[in-house]
Amino acid sequence: MPIRAGSLLIPDSDLSIAFIKSGGPGGQNVNKVSSAVQLRFDLEGCALLDERVKARLRRLAGRRLTDEGAVLLIARGERSQEQNRRDAEARLAALIEAALVEP
């Protein structure tokens, strides 16, 4: 599902989602269900963003930027995959929107 960030629509081809097991509270279910979400955004491969926006996004991403040039967000605060996916997508959209603002 594409992610809307301001006036941009980030296509699925620039995103990948993996579901992983989440630790912490949640009862026995937490050890059986992969409810945490890893959302990866291919920043370097994204054709929608110009180089200035990419540079700002690299700065904003900080340690969430991988060596391959992808932004990696992990959401594990909720008990369901769907809620964690929405959280990760909202955080990515907020990062991109912040990078779109020229200083």
Residue ranges, per PLM feature:
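Ribosome-associated translation termination/rescue signal centered on the conserved GGQ peptidyl-tRNA hydrolysis loop
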Residues: 1-103
